[in-house]
Design a protein with these regions (language model features):
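Short alpha-helical transmembrane segments in multi-pass integral membrane proteins
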Residues: 1-23, 80-146, 192-250, 306-371, ...
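Transmembrane helix-bundle signature of multi-pass secondary active exporters and lipid flippases
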Residues: 24-78, 141-148, 208, 243-308, ...
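Generic alpha-helical transmembrane segments of integral inner-membrane proteins
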Residues: 27, 31, 35, 39, ...
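Helix-loop interface residues and adjacent transmembrane-helix termini in multi-pass membrane transporters
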Residues: 35-38, 46-49, 83-86, 160-161, ...
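Interfacial helix-loop-helix junctions of multi-pass membrane proteins
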Residues: 44, 184-198
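Small-residue-rich hydrophobic transmembrane alpha-helices
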Residues: 52-111, 115, 148-167, 280-343, ...
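Short runs within selected transmembrane alpha-helices of multi-pass transporters and secretion channels
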Residues: 73, 77, 141-159, 167-175, ...
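Short loop-to-helix capping motifs
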Residues: 127, 163-164, 274, 354, ...
């Protein structure tokens, strides 16, 4: 009787290597994308305080919608990863074409909603010039939203067939383009019109269409895409396929919206305590967000690793890949937490020369160090769960964690409302909100870890 073929042996080293190869180009791309926002703020700050305020307000609306669209479009990552693992390569072109139709629709809806969101500016007591510039910033930059949504469809396609290099190269080129066109249009160099903060919006909107074009060109030209090339023929929308991807993608979008809007709400609530509190909070949050790019990139890679393993009918490897990814994220979190604890004063001084802001920022960075472990765990576990094509449960957990625990607890500690019987004697201001964020992230991490354990065990058992 012939021996049955042995299952491949999984080793931590090979899985870590595979996940790192997938993730590091995406990390470089994420950092370049973040760099565009940093460049917008830094370059506009040299024009005037009013222009900087307008760009900051406009970017806050834009970024919330951008991250939400990113989540809605993420369903293609899971679908293509499963098809790749199952070696169903002939199915992938159809999925990509439908994802592009979905991206066009999602992008147009997001463009409309982004413009409607500017109505908020009329009710928050802005100076007329700041209101007008912030609204114009949003109106212009929203024109890039359809391109961004379609780009994210192609982003999910290329990363899920293990082709992550274009993501890095195109994002870096996009950053360079953004900085150059900012220089032209913000300051009116080389005879171009001096648009101030609106010049950032023009640069970003054009840059998004160019990034979409660059990705299309790369897919058309590179040999790695020949087996799954999606542009062999025209295909009308298949509403059943698009509906299936929306069914997976909308919960991810809601999750991202809940998280980003919670952090945005904290920033607005902290604003009542004055410039020092707001500045220290924003610096600590900015640095924590920068560090978060690493576990976020591991998370996108995890969707691919887990999805491909499930596609090939190997739930044991999927579970192994998931926990190795969680362990990698935790290992990085330990290092980043140690770094923040050791260098929190240096980090604060790098951002500001104001002694009062430095002192409070160094204090808030203690909380940032504390939630590194929870934040890395929740993003890794939720991404792994999405690799199983399960998106509603992470949404429910994260909405509960941020809006059911983090914000209410933060508001009680930060604002000390008189009507609440267990409020602190004095408002803890920004520190109180950070305690709430640590609590919310920890609850999310614990519940998502339990969910991943239960889900992966059921799949291994064949249920």
């Amino acid at each position: 009787m012939p021996a049955s073929p042995a299952r491949p042996v999984f080793t931590v080293r090979t899985e870590m290597s595979a996940l790192w190869r997938l993730s590091w180009p995406m990390l470089a791309g994420q950092l370049a994308t973040v760099g565009m926002g940093v460049a917008d703020v830094a370059m506009t700050g040299h024009v005037s305080a009013a222009e900087l305020a307008a760009v900051s307000l406009g970017a806050s609306v834009w970024s919330i919608m951008l991250v939400t669209v990113m989540g809605v479009m993420m369903a293609i990552n899971t679908v293509v990863a499963h098809e790749t693992g199952a070696a169903q390569y002939e199915r992938i072109p159809h999925v990509v074409r439908q994802a592009l139709w979905k991206g066009l629709g999602v992008g147009l809806v997001a463009c409309l909603l982004t413009n409607l969101a500017t109505l908020v500016f009329d009710h928050i007591g802005l100076e007329p010039a700041v209101n007008a510039n912030a609204s114009m910033f949003v109106h212009v930059i929203s024109l890039g939203m359809p391109a961004f949504a379609c780009y994210r469809a192609l982003y999910g396609y290329t990363t899920s067939i293990n082709q992550t290099k274009p993501v890095m190269v195109i994002a870096v080129l996009g950053l360079l383009f953004n900085v150059f066109v900012n220089w032209l249009l913000i300051y009116g160099n080389w005879g171009m019109p001096k648009l101030g903060g609106v010049g950032c919006a023009v640069a970003t909107a054009i840059g998004m269409w160019l990034m979409l074009g660059a990705m299309l060109f790369w897919i058309h030209s590179a040999p790695a895409y020949r087996q799954t090339y999606p542009f062999t023929h025209w295909e009308w929308p298949n509403w059943r396929e698009i509906g299936s991807m929306l069914h997976m993608g909308i919960p991810i979008g809601v999750t991202y919206f809940a998280e980003v809007s919670a952090f945005g709400a904290v920033s607005l609530l902290v604003a009542r305590f004055g410039v020092v509190q707001v500045s220290a909070h924003q610096i600590a949050l900015n640095f924590a967000s920068l560090v978060f790019m690493v576990p976020l990139s591991f998370g996108v890679g995890l969707i691919t690793r887990v999805g491909q393993a499930l596609g090939e009918g190997n739930p044991e490897r999927a579970r192994f890949a998931a926990w190795v990814g969680v362990a990698m994220s935790l290992a990085f979190a330990v290092l980043s937490a140690g770094f923040i604890l050791a260098f929190r004063w240096q980090i604060a001084r790098a951002y500001t020369s104001d002694p009062a802001v430095q002192q409070l920022c160094a204090h808030l960075l203690l909380f940032a160090a504390l939630f590194q472990l929870s934040d890395a765990t929740q993003v890794a576990t939720s991404s792994a769960i999405r690799g199983y094509k399960v998106t509603r449960q992470p949404m429910q957990i994260q909405v509960l964690a941020f809006w059911g625990f983090a914000l209410p607890v933060g508001a009680i500690l930060g604002l000390a409302p008189a009507w609440f019987p267990w409020s602190p004697a004095q408002p803890l201001a920004a520190a109180g909100f950070w305690i709430g964020l640590v609590l919310g992230l920890t609850i999310a991490a614990v519940l998502l870890t339990w969910s991943l354990h239960a889900l992966s065990a059921r799949r291994v058992a064949g249920r």
